[in-house]
């Protein structure tokens, strides 16, 4: 970077922090740095891979496996997780330390495939299947014929759906975060979700928050900061078991667990806090055993962008626990920002959800698979120069704009099936389920939130 830039920055007023100066310097340096882009061409996306490569190689580490160079050695997929690759000469050592290596000693709350089914027949009395499901009725139809059959059904459904309401909120606990980041879209989403939690009585020092699909736990950290922001000394009287549980099957760096504890200790009013994390798939999680040593007073389930079938598995994990049994008052509520309905699994939907879809005309696995394809139209991008009114020779024969509108209807249908199912199951327990847009679509296309709250709130 030119010396004059550094001199200009150094001469700026003292109120500009060192961090701000460093960010400005980095911004200039990034412009000058040549990006060594991977040369692998992704035919499906009609573009090159965006990942960085080493200066002496043509491809990034993930695509070296597709184009091995004899003088460099062979790159092979990891047998434990083929989403990453490794040099063949290092494979033996890699398998000993790979993060995808199965655990030898599972935690006591691990029960393989526990939540792929319901432990008790909760649905027997709550809803009767009308018997109209037919898994084989569409087996003879090709993709184009499936579109021709189900697009008119979705168009008819569209006319019967009232628009979702907006519930855009915010919480002052994220004011510092919003001032720190230049790209505010995640902070805006977090602020609205937490503001909605407060509005619905889900934000309190007497809650234990269980974050599913937590990643590094960023949502929980800002929930904690917001709880601390609202905290009064009188709120601590008789309160206990405040804390956070983290559930994620992935390996996450820069986890927020310790920062949450630090924030609580450094708060004006010091708070005792419990955190607990498990690297586990939701389908294998025994919620009661995970919570046993904590024994929380009230449990609130939260998640930001819980992907596809993970939302349905979360519902099942709660239904398989004591939290949603009639004699328990530990369940405090739930707030989930949903995403990726195109990767939902038909066999993981609650039986009531499947029955709802069947009542709307989607009675087979093939029909659900075509519904998922249509769902993806709601969030797929438009290439530069694409005319919204052009079909672009799409197999459906629809324009981009028509596909986007139908994609939103398909997404809404799956979401409504979840609301229908959970209302049947939680209404008798004194809860109700609601759904709303929590931010504008310009912030995120995945802007739908599902919330379960006590009727008394």
Curated annotation (Swiss-Prot):
It comes from the Eukaryota. It is an enzyme of class 2 (transferase). GO terms for biological process: tRNA nucleoside ribose methylation. The keyword DNA repair does not apply. Zn(2+) binds at residues 78, 84, 94, 98. The keyword Nucleus applies. InterPro entries: Methyltransferase_TRM13 (IPR007871), Trm13 (IPR039044), TRM13/UPF0224_CHHC_Znf_dom (IPR022776), Znf_CCCH-type_TRM13 (IPR021721). Its main location: cytoplasm. GO terms for cellular component: cytoplasm; nucleolus. It catalyses: cytidine(4) in tRNA(Pro) + S-adenosyl-L-methionine = 2'-O-methylcytidine(4) in tRNA(Pro) + S-adenosyl-L-homocysteine + H(+); cytidine(4) in tRNA(Gly)(GCC) + S-adenosyl-L-methionine = 2'-O-methylcytidine(4) in tRNA(Gly)(GCC) + S-adenosyl-L-homocysteine + H(+); adenosine(4) in tRNA(His) + S-adenosyl-L-methionine = 2'-O-methyladenosine(4) in tRNA(His) + S-adenosyl-L-homocysteine + H(+). Pfam families: TRM13 (PF05206), zf-TRM13_CCCH (PF11722), zf-U11-48K (PF05253). Signal peptide: none annotated. Keywords: Cytoplasm, Metal-binding, Methyltransferase, Nucleus, S-adenosyl-L-methionine, Transferase, tRNA processing, Zinc, Zinc-finger. One of its GO terms (molecular function) is zinc ion binding. Its EC number is 2.1.1.225. It is found in: Cytoplasm; Nucleus, Nucleolus. A zinc finger (CHHC U11-48K-type) spans 75-102. Residues 1-29 are annotated as: Disordered. PROSITE patterns: ZF_CHHC_U11_48K. Belongs to the methyltransferase TRM13 family. tRNA methylase which 2'-O-methylates cytidine(4) in tRNA(Pro) and tRNA(Gly)(GCC), and adenosine(4) in tRNA(His). This is tRNA:m(4)X modification enzyme TRM13. It comes from Debaryomyces hansenii (strain ATCC 36239 / CBS 767 / BCRC 21394 / JCM 1990 / NBRC 0083 / IGC 2968). The lineage of its organism: Eukaryota, Fungi, Dikarya, Ascomycota, Saccharomycotina. The gene is TRM13.
